[in-house]
């Protein structure tokens, strides 16, 4: 019985990982409505992904230097179809793991939490540092 519980516990905490190419997006989208209903802010730790529900918390690691950033999925993009990328990071998130001039980087993407995933936020809310922290409460314990 204890062994089964241990195995189940381990499976629950195994994160889903994928390897992909990432880029960033910023000033041209500043203040505009994102696909999730939030107003985009380039200075917040967010990303655009077509593969994960809004509100999913991801750990994105630059494979070249092993620097990581924790981001929240708040947008979608046409980058996959046009350019073969899996994720676009906010300018702030990208600068945490690479120099802006690099443009495209190879990353590992891990799902950390889907506990606060959502369909759409009405009323054009602004995603703030306080809101970011609220998405991380599940993983901070």
Protein language model features and the residues they cover:
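Sec-dependent signal peptide recognition
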Residues: 2-9
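Secreted/periplasmic proteins
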Residues: 5, 17-141
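Hydrophobic core
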Residues: 10-17
